[in-house]
């Protein structure tokens, strides 16, 4: 990854808050293999009055447009800590991207200190509202001052 992306490295302390903020984009990198996948995690009902607090839709980047080339994989249930691949997904449950996100939520998400070879980077935009991050605190956490509750 480019040197400047080190600024977007999520710490273990900020990881869960950022990913479950409601509209997060992040890249999971395995430094040993060099494999990486970019995911979007969006809270169910986001942008409506029907927001469900514990259901998150997971999509993977499949094309060259980093904003819109995402394909739905499945759902993460934050209250149970459980990821489920959806039968409605156009991507097979045996696809590497699905295996990575399943492993991410089942193993890494709750024990990131045990996997030093894995790095998680945010996209440089707030994981909740999507605005560009500009303050040092926001860049570190992945959440803007308002969304991160610092103002």
Task: Write out the residue ranges for each language-model feature.
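Cys/His-clustered metal-coordination modules, chiefly Zn-binding fingers
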Residues: 95-151
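Intrinsically disordered, low-complexity regulatory segments enriched in Ser/Thr/Pro
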Residues: 51-89
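A short, sequence-level motif marking secondary-structure junctions
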Residues: 42-46, 77-78, 140-141
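Non-membrane alpha-helical secondary structure
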Residues: 7, 92-97
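Glycine-centered flexibility motif
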Residues: 22-24, 74, 142-144
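Compositionally biased, intrinsically disordered low-complexity regions
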Residues: 36, 47-49, 65, 76, ...
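General detector of N-terminal leader/presequence modules that precede the first folded domain
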Residues: 1-57
């Amino acid at each position: 990854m480019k040197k400047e992306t080190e600024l977007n490295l999520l710490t273990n302390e900020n990881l869960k808050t950022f990913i479950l903020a409601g509209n997060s984009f992040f890249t999971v990198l395995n430094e040993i293999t060099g494999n990486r996948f970019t995911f979007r995690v969006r809270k169910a009902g986001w942008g409506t009055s029907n927001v469900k607090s514990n259901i998150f839709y997971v999509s993977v980047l499949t094309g060259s447009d980093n904003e819109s080339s995402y394909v739905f994989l499945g759902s993460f249930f934050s209250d149970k800590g459980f990821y489920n691949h959806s039968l409605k997904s156009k991507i097979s449950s045996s696809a590497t991207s699905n295996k990575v996100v399943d492993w991410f939520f089942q193993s890494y998400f709750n024990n990131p200190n045990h996997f030093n070879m894995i790095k998680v980077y945010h996209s440089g935009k707030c994981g909740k509202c999507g605005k560009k991050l500009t303050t040092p605190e926001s860049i570190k956490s992945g959440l803007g001052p308002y969304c991160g509750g610092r103002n």
